[in-house]
Amino acid sequence: MRAHTVILGAGATMAAIPNGDRYGKKSSVMNGMISKLGLDDLLVDVELETKSENIEDIYSELCMKHEYVDVVIELEKRLYDYFDSFEIPVPPTVYDFLILSLTEKDVIATFNWDPLLLQAYVRCNEITNNLPHLL
């Protein structure tokens, strides 16, 4: 049988926890993320040229302006802390079903910042060890 490669992005996190994580904490797609995660206070004294609400556009502009290095560091820290605190819900998620539908010949590559895929992987490992590789 042929190997499968599955690439996951922000939409996968949204699909995995549409009602929030184990404690109701919500995720966000890139557009509007700053507001949805309550990070607006970081940009109060920042003058952005971009009119985009996409965090990738905002982050790119902040990184190009040396006067905002402290804002970038704080934004990175708060984003990391926010996503790192997610806990997978008790009922199986789409991550569980995806992992269990693949085998050790397959690969799941993710660009997500949260630990949900890894948490689902650990949970699925209690059922079988014939699991896909994670990148």
Residues of each region from the PLM?
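Acidic, His- and aromatic-enriched active-site or binding-groove loops in soluble protein domains
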Residues: N130-L135
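Gly/serine-rich nucleotide phosphate-binding loop at the start of the catalytic core
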Residues: M1-A120, N125-N129
